[in-house]
């Protein structure tokens, strides 16, 4: 029968794929995979979110940096001084250099208008 052989081959193939994936996970976690970005045997350190971006030494100055690597603070002070809320500055790779935090305003209490009486000459008869 050919079916047990096929399922055994499929199981072996699946096992090899899972082993390969596990090996790659361990290499990524250990930082062993070389991306070929430099001629040295060292892997460039991964860029973590929230850290300032600096160009690696093998790139010329200004190459490889996003245009918003240094968030513009010139818009931060006037904006934060003219609004009801406040802003949290952040290093963002998406162009938004600060997050607005607006206060939660309670609704105004409804005031009841005093009952008006109509004049007798206007009231319906």
From Swiss-Prot:
Q: Where is this region: Disordered?
A: 43-77
Comp. bias intervals (Polar residues): 67-77
Native source organism of the sequence: Drosophila persimilis (Fruit fly)
Recorded GO cellular component terms are:
nucleoplasm; SOSS complex
**Where do transmembrane segments lie in this chain?**
none
Return the similarity comment.
Belongs to the SOSS-C family.
Provide a GO biological process annotation: DNA repair
Q: What is this protein called?
A: SOSS complex subunit C homolog
